[in-house]
Amino acid sequence: MGKPVVAIVGRPNVGKSTIFNRIAGERISIVEDTPGVTRDRIYSSAEWLNYDFNLIDTGGIDIGDEPFLAQIRHQAEIAMDEADVIIFMVNGRDGVTSADEEVAKILYRTKKPVVLAVNKLDNPEMRSDVYDFYALGFGEPYPISGTHGLGLGDLLDAVAEHFKNLPDTQYDEQVVQFCLIGRPNVGKSSLVNAMLGEDRVIVSNIAGTTRDAVDTMFAYNQRDFVIVDTAGMRKKGKVYETTEKYSVLRALKAIDRSDVVAVVLDGEEGIIEQDKRIAGYAHEAGKAVVIVVNKWDAVEKDERTMKEFEQNIREHFQFLDYAPVLFMSALTKKRIHTLMPSIITASENHAMRVQTNILNDIIMDAVAMNPTPTHNGQRLKIYYATQVAIKPPSFVVFVNDPELMHFSYERFLENRIRDAFGFEGTPIKIFARARK
């Protein structure tokens, strides 16, 4: 199954971002005292008791200029829809407020587990204030202090207990799972429909792990594939259309469960900043990536247009220089046939293992071609290399001093490895370690 998702829900100014940063282990959100302040980044990976999970700060979801109670209602709705476990946060210094009760009423209706966190109880004398919060009806309240980090261990223990009971959707390892991500209206659903409309494709819908996620399984050229969360692509409704970050949240979950990510761009509108952010999620997750330019039928073009558009993509998506770029139209189905072969190639390269002796021949030839760098009179020495992981392919290069491995030389080695083995569509990782 994908990583569990934990959402932090609560009215403004109860300390959601402070707790988010404490659990995530880094200061990702902007923390201010102004109620309702919005944040740019609302998610992070975290770990507790050997569980990896995604943490969501719903306080970062801006619904716009709506009445206060409508905002927290929307916030709780999104958490209910996407989270596996909800941390309901209140301010222990304020006691139970009507706004807390409003959030609680909404959370009662969800079947998701809720853990109640009473924040801002910064010293032991204040802990007695926690008992008032039993009235909210979520069982034991956990006293915490985001400022000092007190009580977080007990809170996370309670959250992790619920991970054991989560449903698990496992597909056979031979089944390639992929998703289509992109901003609204780039044509993700239309692409799926165009793909599944081919005669060679046999389709069946599989219930996913979230309440309304549906994965679509199909056979292509006698192999099984799963398109992750086809329901998410079709999700409509006012709260979701007005909340860009809702679709980001959904895309994160789909990326996490996929082997290959197809990043869909709108050929008619061109590239915008949101496209780069969405593509960045796939790259950060270490997934294989294919870039799809949809609506190519609507673009006025000459013999240079496609090449210029691809150059523009390469300039904006330098971090995805390994990803193939495909041009197609879901409407006319032109070039749709190129998508599945590219996904298959990216998937196979993502899981590729190379022979150690051939790898080392490549590395030593590279060193002979371009000698290793020196720093303060000391030269980097490379002894040998080995592949340590797949999905994505990861390599350890054993050296005399890892500090001497400049990023530009690491990039040079990556390029030589790519020249030798291909690896189109997948990132590869290289780590320098000292030989013991």
Swiss-Prot record:
Keywords: GTP-binding, Nucleotide-binding, Repeat, Ribosome biogenesis. PROSITE patterns: G_ENGA (PS51712). One of its GO terms (molecular function) is ribosome binding. Residues 352-436 form the KH-like domain. It comes from the Bacteria. GTP 2 binds at residues 182-189, 229-233, 294-297. Signal peptide: none annotated. GTP 1 binds at residues 10-17, 57-61, 119-122. Residues 4-167, 176-351 form the EngA-type G domain. GO terms for biological process: ribosome biogenesis. Associates with the 50S ribosomal subunit. GTPase that plays an essential role in the late steps of ribosome biogenesis. HAMAP family: GTPase_Der (MF_00195). Belongs to the TRAFAC class TrmE-Era-EngA-EngB-Septin-like GTPase superfamily. EngA (Der) GTPase family. This is GTPase Der.
